[in-house]
Amino acid sequence: MKYFAAFLPMRDLEKSQELRPGHIAFLDQMSQEGKIFARGRFVDGAGGLIIYIAESLEEARKVAKSDPYVAGGARSLELHEWDMKIVS
């Protein structure tokens, strides 16, 4: 499995607030399915970041585009494969 960093820059704050319950439900479901490594918002309100776990960029993009924030136009999507290194 590979890791993919999904940056979700804010496009529409009002839409984000409306879509938040669906976004949280989506994150919970994807987490239960083992498709999310980490997630969180940017403290400055600029958006958020989700680290997806997937076999390919195409698979990660399909999942990321199904996020209500992205599908609803509240957030943009910038997706990159992430070569994670754990520093001890």
Model-derived regions: residue spans:
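Conserved, structured core segments of small domains
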Residues: 1-88
